[in-house]
Amino acid sequence: MYPAHLLVLLAVCVSLLGASDMPPQPLNLVQFSNMIQCANHGRRPTSNYMDYGCYCGKGGSGTPVDELDRCCKIHDDCYGEAEKSQKCAPYWTWYTWKCGSDGPQCDDSETGSRRFVCGYDATAAKCFAKAPYNKENYNIETRCQ
């Protein structure tokens, strides 16, 4: 490959990186997203959960609107508890897990914060998979005050 071609390729790659409107995700959220896909067997994209109800996605307030939103509130509360009592950073905690026939399973060798966060994520992912998804509850922050 000619040096000029390499420069053009590099320029394209750099411009694509700058054009991305998605902020970098904490490592754990990537794992959690994969767990959700494992639990629901790919039936629903993870993006459907990013702005659902009052608690699915960043932050949360008000009263959960349904069973799925309650799953998100419980998960948020668990992360808050992990930050306080376990003194860990759940959004950045990396753990080992596998996708089994009955959903995500945490590696038994994990201990401490890794075990707690993996357990919270696996439980939430299974809860998401069981809960009905109501399209009317997507992007409703005005009802969550």
UniProtKB/Swiss-Prot annotation:
Positions bound to Ca(2+): Y55, G57, G59, D76
Keywords: Calcium, Disulfide bond, Hemostasis impairing toxin, Hydrolase, Lipid degradation, Lipid metabolism, Metal-binding, Platelet aggregation inhibiting toxin, Secreted, Signal, Toxin
Post-translational modification: This enzyme lacks two of the seven disulfide bonds found in similar PLA2 proteins.
Disulfide bonds: C38-C99, C54-C144, C56-C72, C71-C127, C106-C118
Free-text tissue specificity from the UniProt record: Expressed by the venom gland.
Coarse class of the protein's main subcellular location: secreted
Signal peptide from the UniProt entry: 1-19
CDD domains with a match to the protein in the record: PLA2c
GO molecular function: calcium ion binding; calcium-dependent phospholipase A2 activity; phospholipid binding; toxin activity
InterPro entries per the UniProt record, alphabetical: PLipase_A2, PLipase_A2_dom, PLipase_A2_dom_sf, PLipase_A2_His_AS
One of the GO biological process terms: arachidonate secretion
Major enzyme class: hydrolase
Cofactor: Ca(2+)
Residue numbers annotated as active site: H75, D121
Keyword DNA damage: no
Pfam families assigned: Phospholip_A2_1
Family listed: Belongs to the phospholipase A2 family. Group I subfamily. D49 sub-subfamily.
Role noted for this protein: Snake venom phospholipase A2 (PLA2) that inhibits collagen-induced platelet aggregation. PLA2 catalyzes the calcium-dependent hydrolysis of the 2-acyl groups in 3-sn-phosphoglycerides.
Protein name in the entry: Acidic phospholipase A2 S1-11
Species in which this protein is naturally found: Austrelaps superbus
Origin organism lineage: Eukaryota, Metazoa, Chordata, Craniata, Vertebrata
